[in-house]
């Protein structure tokens, strides 16, 4: 009887040691495929090992919420499904102006080759020809100081400002487009019949994959950024008696 009891206790202890602790490794509210999370966890383990050997000051800064110069595995950036033409990791600031047509072209699945040629083509063939106007005026810029954002589940997450890849510091940029003015003309949107319609310009959003922090863990998440300026219409009430 004592031998059977000892065997059961031993099996129970082995089972506890062999049980995977996945809940402590996976960020809450995130659904990463297991293969991808394994690679991400490997890079985090590497970063933690380096952090333990670093001075106490930088470690305390990271724990306090700093999201700069976090070491990540370069293999994470080879996943094609994680790429977005509106998200850029670069060691230097990108050009001030960018071609939104190129961004849409790349989203559709075309290979981003010969970008210089497309830029020249766009500059020689403007979007609006003589006599053509935009209903709403928009402005597009590369944003490199984003610290927080809203994820696809409505939760506010911390955005990684910089990452360390192969001992080089890359900054995370987001190409955002928003309305320059909600009312480009006194009546609202340009070219709309104000006698029958109310109108105004508003910024719309989309979700892109970005590197974020959740607690002490880095992970890819869909975050919301500004991507377009559109005209909103509503029919005016009839004045019939």
From Swiss-Prot:
Residues 1-18 form the signal peptide. Disulfide bonds join 136-201, 179-229, 189-231. Residues 19-121 form a propeptide. One of its GO terms (cellular component) is axon. Pfam families: NGF (PF00243). It is found in: Secreted; Endosome lumen. GO terms for molecular function: growth factor activity; metalloendopeptidase inhibitor activity; nerve growth factor receptor binding. Glycans are attached at residues 69, 114, 166. One of its GO terms (biological process) is modulation of chemical synaptic transmission. Keywords: Cleavage on pair of basic residues, Disulfide bond, Endosome, Glycoprotein, Growth factor, Metalloenzyme inhibitor, Metalloprotease inhibitor, Protease inhibitor, Secreted, Signal. Its main location: secreted. The keyword Ligase does not apply. The keyword Nucleotide-binding does not apply. Homodimer. The homodimer interacts with a single NTRK1 chain. The homodimer interacts with a single NGFR chain. The NGF dimer interacts with a single SORCS2 chain (via extracellular domain). The NGF precursor (proNGF) binds to a receptor complex formed by SORT1 and NGFR, which leads to NGF endocytosis. Both mature NGF and the immature NGF precursor (proNGF) interact with SORCS2 and with the heterodimer formed by SORCS2 and NGFR (via extracellular domains). The NGF precursor (proNGF) has much higher affinity for SORCS2 than mature NGF. Nerve growth factor is important for the development and maintenance of the sympathetic and sensory nervous systems. Extracellular ligand for the NTRK1 and NGFR receptors, activates cellular signaling cascades through those receptor tyrosine kinase to regulate neuronal proliferation, differentiation and survival. Inhibits metalloproteinase dependent proteolysis of platelet glycoprotein VI. Belongs to the NGF-beta family. This is Beta-nerve growth factor. It comes from Saimiri boliviensis boliviensis. The gene is NGF.
């Amino acid at each position: 009887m004592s031998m059977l009891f000892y065997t059961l206790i031993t099996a129970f202890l082995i089972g506890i040691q062999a049980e995977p602790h996945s809940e402590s490794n996976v960020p809450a509210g995130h659904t990463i495929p297991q293969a991808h999370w394994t690679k991400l966890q490997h890079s985090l383990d590497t970063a933690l090992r380096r952090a333990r050997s670093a001075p106490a000051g930088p470690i305390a800064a990271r724990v306090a919420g700093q999201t700069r110069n976090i070491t990540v595995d370069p293999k994470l950036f080879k996943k094609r499904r994680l790429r977005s033409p509106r998200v850029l990791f670069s060691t230097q600031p990108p050009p001030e102006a960018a071609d939104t047509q190129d961004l849409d072209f790349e989203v559709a699945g075309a290979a981003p080759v010969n970008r210089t040629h497309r830029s020249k083509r766009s500059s020689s063939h403007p979007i609006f020809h003589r006599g053509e106007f935009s209903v709403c005026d928009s402005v597009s810029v590369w944003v490199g100081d984003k610290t927080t954002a809203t994820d696809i589940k409505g939760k506010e997450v911390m955005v990684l400002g910089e990452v360390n890849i192969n001992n080089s510091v890359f900054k995370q940029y987001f190409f955002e487009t928003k309305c320059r003015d909600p009312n480009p003309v006194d009546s609202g949107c340009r070219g709309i019949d104000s006698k029958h319609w109310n109108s105004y310009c508003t910024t719309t959003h989309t979700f892109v994959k970005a590197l974020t922090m959740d607690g002490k863990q880095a992970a890819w998440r869909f975050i919301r950024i500004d991507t377009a300026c559109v005209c909103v219409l509503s029919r005016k009430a009839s004045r019939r008696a």
